[in-house]
Amino acid sequence: AAFREVTARIKRALKIPVVASNRINTPELAEEILASGDADLVSMARPLLADPELVNKAAAGKPEAINTCIACNQACLDHAFGMKRVSCLVNPRACHETELEYARAAQKKRVAVVGAGMAGLACATVAAARGHDVTLFEASDSVGGQFRLAAVVPGKEEFRETIRYFGYELERTGVKLKLGQRASAADLVGFDEVVIATGVVPRVPRIPGIDHPKVLTYAQLLGEKRPVGERVAVIGAGGIGIDVCEYLLHEPNISLKDWCAEW
């Protein structure tokens, strides 16, 4: 609710209903804004792409079941601006509901999913919801994959919400989760289907000195909190490179006052 304060000021100056919008992505926040009198109505757009059942789940008293919008804009706004079909990074069924129909499986199978990043979590929970017996293997001690790294970048803290949501879905759908277990061929014997969802690894360029102790990958920086010096060179200006710069330059818990001053 980044513009809540502005909405409240407008409401105090007008005698007509005022609608609050922008980053109101949970029912609790929406209720708080309405109860405080800062707005008469609340507008939600992206949160309903992330979970079209948001209102129904809130009304049923199950906010933990909501797939929360993380404001990534990677399939909604950017697609809209590019004249493409809008969808959602955390809900790929958005605007594809008639094409991606998760019908009950005609035959129950034993399915192994290797890797508990976002792709593996989505695959495992959908397969289980369709009636399959699913086991999910993850080599590390927690689920989330690359989203765990993204969540430490200032401004991307809400990526943790997607990890939380899939934790709920794993339990709801009955997926058997094997943490700290790197799946071997022996582990996968007896399954009818095996899905490999082990994700990506950083691409290390062949540059003289790349093996120097001061050279880090983004995973070592964000995931292991490796220390860096005062002057840092970042190789790669894609999304991850920008995130690394944001991580190095900004405090993770910026105040609303400082945020407003910056923007």
Segments from the language model and where they lie:
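Short, electropositive alpha-helical surface patch
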Residues: 30-43, 187-197, 252
